[in-house]
């Protein structure tokens, strides 16, 4: 929709609080609009009228616009009422986009969005020193959309995109697509179409960057006029990832990625996408190359949680689906001495890829949370006594504490933890492959709990 040039005096309903909704609320107040908040929970203090979100819609004050928070289901009665009354419904991203005057790179995909958003911003920091990153990652767009900055790098989730009008971004990145959020989108086609809303397909001045698989899908079924670029491991990709030479080749530069810090093919593919986006928006290749080795990743994403005497712990709490976990583990070494910690609230996913991974061999698996109800039987059929089932992460570390510590022959003071006669572990990888909401507010709280348990455990090991 086209926003009025001034929001002053307009009655606008913000449906859903949270980070996004509250940011939109504050922006509307700053623009002298007359916002109304409608949410499940009443805030302790608010300077605007509040209504519970289960109120009969006809009891709400008359408004000219609804701003929907991404967590609100499309079937909410207030949204149906707005549609009947022809009241426009927009997203917080729509609101920010209308008032922002700089260039925008948007990033979406099932996995890797946050890392890629942060990586693109990192690569462009010299070329665009005033840039800001945000959206679904960190800072809501409306909290800085009226600042005089040259570039915004935005992570955009499918929830945000399905609510948005055409965003007319300068560069869009669609990383990958795997089964996720089907409780919301119902089908993979709906999920794909929500993600694809990031693209300005009919605009020849727009650049859409996609994986090889998504490019093939677009070429086979979708009409487009935008500039379509791909990244991947085939030589005809616009950003060709050569795993043998550790180079990424574009039409403008050959990048040395041998000192790129993040492990795994999936992270190198994210880097290839990031390089293309950085080039397309105007980043200088020499500057991009200089910054590649300096990126250290984000917390809770295959982060080293602790190391001592050859024992290592990895915190990958951001892994909230099987696709993410399997991508991280694809190049993991010493798998037969690795304890994989899985669990939480599982999503509607095919478990065959998990079984195919485990059948190749694993040190052991600890399974916790709600996932035990649906995952235990299938995993046990494959790895038998190498599966431990517990209630929570605290119980997980009780298993580790009961293990016996043995020195590794010929390796100075290095040790291994023997959990049973047949299970000896040197690496503990926390990559849950499930949502956190059965026991935690979010994946960050879950990851921080894991980090604290790791610190306590390693403190008890004598040097």
UniProtKB/Swiss-Prot annotation:
GO CC terms in record: cytoplasm
Q: Which InterPro entries match?
A: Mur-like_cat_sf (IPR036565), Mur_ligase_C_dom_sf (IPR036615), Mur_ligase_cen (IPR013221), MurD (IPR005762)
Looking up SUPFAM superfamilies in the UniProt record yields: MurCD N-terminal domain, MurD-like peptide ligases, catalytic domain, MurD-like peptide ligases, peptide-binding domain
What Enzyme Commission number(s) appear in the record? Answer: 6.3.2.9
Pathway membership, UniProt: Cell wall biogenesis; peptidoglycan biosynthesis
Q: Which reaction does it catalyse?
A: UDP-N-acetyl-alpha-D-muramoyl-L-alanine + D-glutamate + ATP = UDP-N-acetyl-alpha-D-muramoyl-L-alanyl-D-glutamate + ADP + phosphate + H(+)
Query: What is a GO molecular function of this protein?
Result: ATP binding
Q: Which residues bind ATP?
A: 109-115
Q: Where in the cell is the protein located?
A: Cytoplasm
Which biological process terms from the Gene Ontology are attached to this UniProt entry? cell division; cell wall organization; peptidoglycan biosynthetic process; regulation of cell shape
- Annotated keywords: ATP-binding, Cell cycle, Cell division, Cell shape, Cell wall biogenesis/degradation, Cytoplasm, Ligase, Nucleotide-binding, Peptidoglycan synthesis
Which is an annotated Pfam family here?
MurD-like_N
The family this protein is said to belong to: Belongs to the MurCDEF family.
What is the recorded function of this protein according to its Swiss-Prot or TrEMBL entry?
Cell wall formation. Catalyzes the addition of glutamate to the nucleotide precursor UDP-N-acetylmuramoyl-L-alanine (UMA).
Q: What is this protein called?
A: UDP-N-acetylmuramoylalanine--D-glutamate ligase
Organism of provenance: Leptospira interrogans serogroup Icterohaemorrhagiae serovar copenhageni (strain Fiocruz L1-130)
Q: What is the lineage of its organism?
A: Bacteria, Pseudomonadati, Spirochaetota, Spirochaetia, Leptospirales
């Amino acid at each position: 929709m086209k926003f009025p040039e001034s929001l002053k005096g307009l009655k606008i309903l913000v449906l859903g609080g949270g980070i996004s909704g509250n940011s939109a609320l504050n922006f509307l107040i700053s623009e002298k609009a007359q916002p109304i908040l409608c949410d499940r929970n009443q805030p302790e203090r608010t300077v605007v009228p509040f209504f519970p979100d289960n109120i009969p819609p006809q009891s709400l004050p008359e408004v000219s616009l609804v701003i929907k928070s991404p967590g609100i289901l499309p079937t909410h009665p207030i949204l149906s009422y707005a549609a009947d009354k022809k009241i426009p419904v927009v997203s917080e991203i729509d609101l920010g986009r209308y008032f922002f005057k700089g260039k925008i790179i948007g990033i979406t995909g099932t996995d890797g969005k946050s890392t890629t958003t942060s990586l693109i911003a990192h690569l462009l920091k010299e070329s665009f020193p005033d840039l800001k990153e945000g959206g679904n990652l960190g800072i809501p767009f409306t909290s800085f959309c009226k600042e005089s900055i040259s570039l915004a790098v935005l992570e955009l989730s499918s929830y945000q995109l399905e609510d948005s009008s055409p965003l007319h971004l300068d560069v869009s990145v669609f990383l990958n697509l795997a089964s996720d959020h089907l409780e919301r989108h119902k089908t993979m086609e709906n999920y794909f179409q929500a993600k694809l809303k990031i693209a300005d397909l009919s605009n020849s001045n727009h650049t859409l960057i996609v994986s090889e698989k998504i490019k093939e899908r677009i070429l086979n079924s979708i009409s487009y006029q935008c500039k379509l670029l791909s990244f991947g491991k085939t030589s005809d990709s616009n950003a060709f990832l050569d795993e043998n030479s550790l180079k990424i080749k574009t039409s403008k530069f050959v990048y040395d990625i041998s000192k790129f810090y993040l492990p795994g093919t999936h992270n190198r593919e994210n880097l290839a996408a990031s390089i293309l986006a950085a080039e397309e928006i105007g980043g200088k290749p020499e500057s991009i190359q200089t910054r590649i080795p300096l990126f250290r990743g984000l917390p809770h994403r295959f982060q080293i949680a602790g190391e001592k005497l050859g024992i290592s712990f990895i915190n990958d709490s951001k892994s909230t689906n099987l696709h993410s976990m399997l991508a991280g583990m694809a190049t993991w070494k010493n798998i037969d001495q690795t304890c994989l910690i899985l669990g939480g609230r599982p999503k509607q996913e095919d478990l065959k890829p998990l079984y195919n991974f485990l059948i190749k061999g694993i040190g052991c698996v600890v399974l916790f949370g709600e996932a035990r109800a649906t995952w235990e039987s299938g995993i046990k059929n494959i790895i038998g006594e190498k599966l431990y089932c517990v209630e929570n992460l605290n119980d997980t570390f009780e298993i580790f504490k009961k293990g016996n510590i043995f020195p590794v022959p010929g390796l100075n003071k290095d040790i291994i933890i023997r959990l049973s006669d047949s299970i000896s572990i040197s690496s503990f990888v926390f990559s849950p492959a499930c949502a956190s909401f059965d026991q935690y507010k979010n994946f960050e709280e879950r990851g921080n709990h894991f980090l604290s348990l790791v610190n306590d455990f390693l403190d008890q090991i004598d040097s």
